[in-house]
Amino acid sequence: MSELSAARELDEIAHTASEGWMIAGLIGGAIVGAALIAVTGGTAAVAVAAVVAGASAGGGLGEVLGSMSWAPRHVTGVLADGSPNVYINGRPAIRAHISTGECSEDGPAKKVVAQGSAKVYINDFPAARINDLLACSAEIHTGSPNVIIGGEKEQTDDIEPEIPDWVNWTLLAAGAGAAAVLATPAIAILGTLGGLGGGFAGSLIGGAFFGEGSDGQKWSMLAGGFVGGFAGGKGGAKFDAWRNTKIVEPPPRVTTKVDPISPPRMTLAEAVGQEQAKVWTQTARANAEKNNAQLSTLLTDDQIGAIYGYTTNEGYTALNPALRGQTPLTPELEAFTGHVTDGLNKLPAYNGETYRGTTLPAHILEQNQIGGTVSDGGFMSTSAKTPFDGDVSISVRGNSGKQIDFLSKYKNEAEVLYPPNTRFEVINRIEQNGTTHLLYREIP
């Protein structure tokens, strides 16, 4: 688990050296390519290709090296819009998704803080720390000298890469084209694919061993790219040798069977009907804007409408029996469930004990013994205030529940909803005055 200095208003933000080192690599690589041609000679096409290949390789290498932790950073602004009521060292604390940074490198508009702690929340949003990123890829450069916040990184907003994707794809295409001129198309294609595959594999291995975003991961990616590119180039050379000696006969005509493409998930309107979806979405959006406008912005129309629809009698009485295998789980109900689950995943976790009142079949109640593990195939509704009616009273301690009363049809229920198949350990069981009292603790 990462432990990093807490971020506050006016703490500095900085960009890496990726852009500057990429430009330096482009220039340096082009010079090296030109020098090689000057020494060895070559046609005009070969000379141009050598310069392009050198520039592409140098630019890509410079971009990666510039992002290393030891590469210099340059300060581009400060953090702003901290918490109105939580202070660290006398300065407002910074929260992901709400707080911003004033970055001189990315125009006059403020950039939202896009990462924070997955364990520590301030005003219901992840607490930001040093090294967390803003939406423009600037990182928080300075922080509190004595307040440390733990937890892995949680991303709340999209992050634009420091080097746009089109630039990297252009470098890749230019390098592959230059390789085709300098060598052969087969060597260029297989070498490029080998480099991409090796780099991807190296990134996965390095991320697992050294951590995501670490220098070790980046070195592993570079090494994998070089090894994969070399192996692919050798494979291309062998292919060229085989092609030049093989007698090629016209292939027989064959009929290729094309598997149908799986259709995308239904919209909420397709799943429950256009009018029903419209009513749910409009009502939920109005409730959310009134009760918690910030959370409202996290959800799409299909997600907010589906969560609201679940809270109605028509919603949960249709979904839960199907999820528990008691009624058919139709494609429409699968889509409905997917939109509810996607929406819950975007909401902050509820911290605290919740309660549930219910009536369980005898064979299910019998499974609820101390030390046992239980789960519900459907969504599990609990309340942050008082349990619902029933001869079984359950107290729940977990961290996967999401409070949805800000959009619910029944706000007074203070509903906290757990996703299907959440696993709990039965910590205690007491029989008292005809009521069974159970204590659940979520299993991570």
Curated annotation (Swiss-Prot):
**Phenotype caused by lack of the gene:** A double tre1-tri1 deletion is outcompeted by wild-type cells, but not by wild-type cells missing a type 6 secretion system (T6SS).
An example Gene Ontology molecular-function term: NAD+ poly-ADP-ribosyltransferase activity
State the reactions this protein catalyses.
L-arginyl-[protein] + NAD(+) = N(omega)-(ADP-D-ribosyl)-L-arginyl-[protein] + nicotinamide + H(+)
Provide the TR mART core domain boundaries. Answer: 266-444
**Per the record, which residues fall in region PAAR domain?**
72-140
The UniProt annotation puts the region (ART domain) at 274-444
Q: What is the effect of changing E415Q?
A: Cells are impaired in interbacterial competetion, no ADP-ribosylation of proteins in target cells, the ART domain is no longer toxic when expressed in E.coli
The EC number(s) given in the record are: 2.4.2.31
Classification via Gene3D superfamilies: 2.60.200.60, Toxin ADP-ribosyltransferase, Chain A, domain 1
An annotated GO cellular component of this protein is: host cell cytoplasm
The yes or no answer to whether the keyword Transferase is present is yes
Q: Where in the cell is it found?
A: Secreted; Host cytoplasm
Signal sequence coordinates: none
Active site, per annotation: R356, S381, E415
- Chief localization: secreted
Kindly state which keywords UniProt assigns to this record, in alphabetical order.
Glycosyltransferase, Host cytoplasm, Nucleotidyltransferase, Secreted, Toxin, Transferase, Virulence
Report the PROSITE patterns cross-referenced here: TR_MART (PS51996)
Entry's family note: Belongs to the Arg-specific ADP-ribosyltransferase family.
Describe its function: Toxic component of a contact-dependent interbacterial competition system (also called effector-immunity systems). Acts by ADP-ribosylating a number of target proteins in target cells; E.coli target proteins include FtsZ, EFTu, RNase E, Fis, RL9, SucB, and LolD. FtsZ is thought to be the physiologically relevant target as it is ADP-ribosylated on a critical residue. ADP-ribosylation of FtsZ prevents formation of the FtsZ mid-cell ring and inhibits cell division. Overexpression of the whole Tre1 protein or the ART domain in E.coli is toxic; cells elongate dramatically and some undergo lysis.
* Domain topic, free-text comment: The ART domain is toxic when expressed as a protein fragment.
Q: How does it assemble?
A: Forms a stable complex with cognate immunity protein Tri1-Sp.
PANTHER family, sorted: ADP-RIBOSYLTRANSFERASE (PTHR10339), SECRETED EXOENZYME S (PTHR10339:SF25)
Q: What is this protein called?
A: NAD(+)--protein-arginine ADP-ribosyltransferase Tre1
According to its UniProt entry, this protein's organism is Serratia proteamaculans (strain 568)
Gene behind the chain? tre1
